[in-house]
Each structure stands twice: as C-alpha cells, then as structure tokens.
C-alpha cells in the first residue's frame, strides 16, 4: 500500500521521467534486453539496437502508460486495466517480465538522477513499480 509520502515521492521522482519518456523508455528497454535476453522473445520484429526507433517508440509507450498510473495513484488498477488485459490475454507476456522491467526502470531513473537516490525514494519507487507489476499480472488469473 502506498502511503501519502510514497505517492508524493513517486510523483516527484517521476517528473523528469514523464518529460523525457522516449529517452527513459528506450534506455530502460535496452537495459532489460541486455540484462535479461529472454525478454527479447516478444520483440522479434523490432530493431533492438540501442537508440533504435523501435525502442524509442515502444519505450515511450511504456513510460506513458506508467505515467498514467502515476497520475492515478489512488486507482492504479483502473489506470492500467486495458494494458493488463492486452498483456495477459492477447500478448501473453511472461508475468515475471514486469518485475524485471520495473527493476531496469529504477536503475535508469537512478542513473539520470545526478547522484544517489535517497533510500526513501528508492523504497517508494519500488513499492509503486511492484504495484504496477502486480496490477499488470492481475488478469493472468
């Protein structure tokens, strides 16, 4: 459960991410595909080289979707409902990939922070991204 402090920290940390969605998204996906090559399975039709237009476009979609969740922290499930359905029913993405994506996103945010993230910010982001992952896999049952 996100506390009011968590929500405030998530919103603050997310500002630069949402303003640079393509950059953060592409970099996060590059990290994901590098660290966890099995996740490439769903993107066989993409050019997965760093900086490719495919990574930029899809990365922006990912960040924009998570931004929608940030904008609806009191109803993350509602904000991600259609996306959850899509990934569970049509795309059939392995649910573990959402946790991996969240981890790579946290690393990307930290890398662009200009210094270490405060522990309480890391905790709040982690709680939020775990909630996002949990929400996205909720339709798998």
Curated annotation (Swiss-Prot):
<keyword id="KW-0561">Oxygen transport</keyword>
<dbReference type="GO" id="GO:0031720">
    <property type="term" value="F:haptoglobin binding"/>
</dbReference>
<dbReference type="InterPro" id="IPR012292">
    <property type="entry name" value="Globin/Proto"/>
</dbReference>
<dbReference type="GO" id="GO:0043177">
    <property type="term" value="F:organic acid binding"/>
</dbReference>
<keyword id="KW-0479">Metal-binding</keyword>
<dbReference type="GO" id="GO:0042744">
    <property type="term" value="P:hydrogen peroxide catabolic process"/>
</dbReference>
<dbReference type="GO" id="GO:0072562">
    <property type="term" value="C:blood microparticle"/>
</dbReference>
<dbReference type="InterPro" id="IPR050056">
    <property type="entry name" value="Hemoglobin_oxygen_transport"/>
</dbReference>
<dbReference type="GO" id="GO:0020037">
    <property type="term" value="F:heme binding"/>
</dbReference>
<dbReference type="InterPro" id="IPR009050">
    <property type="entry name" value="Globin-like_sf"/>
</dbReference>
<dbReference type="GO" id="GO:0031838">
    <property type="term" value="C:haptoglobin-hemoglobin complex"/>
</dbReference>
<comment type="subunit">
    <text>Heterotetramer of two alpha chains and two beta chains.</text>
</comment>
<keyword id="KW-0813">Transport</keyword>
<dbReference type="GO" id="GO:0019825">
    <property type="term" value="F:oxygen binding"/>
</dbReference>
<dbReference type="GO" id="GO:0005833">
    <property type="term" value="C:hemoglobin complex"/>
</dbReference>
<keyword id="KW-0408">Iron</keyword>
<dbReference type="Pfam" id="PF00042">
    <property type="entry name" value="Globin"/>
</dbReference>
<feature type="binding site" description="proximal binding residue">
    <location>
        <position position="87"/>
    </location>
    <ligand>
        <name>heme b</name>
    </ligand>
</feature>
<dbReference type="GO" id="GO:0004601">
    <property type="term" value="F:peroxidase activity"/>
</dbReference>
<dbReference type="GO" id="GO:0005506">
    <property type="term" value="F:iron ion binding"/>
</dbReference>
<dbReference type="InterPro" id="IPR002339">
    <property type="entry name" value="Hemoglobin_pi"/>
</dbReference>
<feature type="domain" description="Globin">
    <location>
        <begin position="1"/>
        <end position="141"/>
    </location>
</feature>
<keyword id="KW-0349">Heme</keyword>
<dbReference type="InterPro" id="IPR002338">
    <property type="entry name" value="Hemoglobin_a-typ"/>
</dbReference>
<comment type="function">
    <text>Involved in oxygen transport from the lung to the various peripheral tissues.</text>
</comment>
<feature type="binding site">
    <location>
        <position position="58"/>
    </location>
    <ligand>
        <name>O2</name>
    </ligand>
</feature>
<dbReference type="GO" id="GO:0005344">
    <property type="term" value="F:oxygen carrier activity"/>
</dbReference>
<comment type="similarity">
    <text>Belongs to the globin family.</text>
</comment>
<dbReference type="InterPro" id="IPR000971">
    <property type="entry name" value="Globin"/>
</dbReference>
<protein>
    <recommendedName>
        <fullName>Hemoglobin subunit alpha-A</fullName>
    </recommendedName>
</protein>
């Amino acid at each position: 459960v996100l506390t009011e402090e968590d929500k405030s920290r998530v919103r603050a940390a997310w500002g630069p991410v949402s303003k640079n969605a393509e950059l953060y998204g592409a970099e996060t996906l590059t990290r994901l595909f590098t660290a966890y090559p099995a996740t490439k399975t769903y993107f066989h039709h993409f050019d997965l080289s760093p900086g490719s237009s495919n990574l930029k476009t899809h990365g922006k979609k990912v960040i924009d979707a998570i931004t929608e969740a940030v904008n609806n922290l009191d109803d993350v499930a509602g904000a991600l409902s259609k996306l959850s359905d899509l990934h569970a029913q049509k795309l059939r993405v392995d649910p573990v990939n959402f946790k991996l994506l969240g981890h790579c996103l946290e690393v990307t945010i930290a890398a662009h922070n200009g210094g270490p993230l405060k522990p309480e910010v890391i905790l709040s982001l982690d709680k939020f991204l775990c909630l996002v992952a949990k929400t996205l896999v909720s339709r798998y049952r």
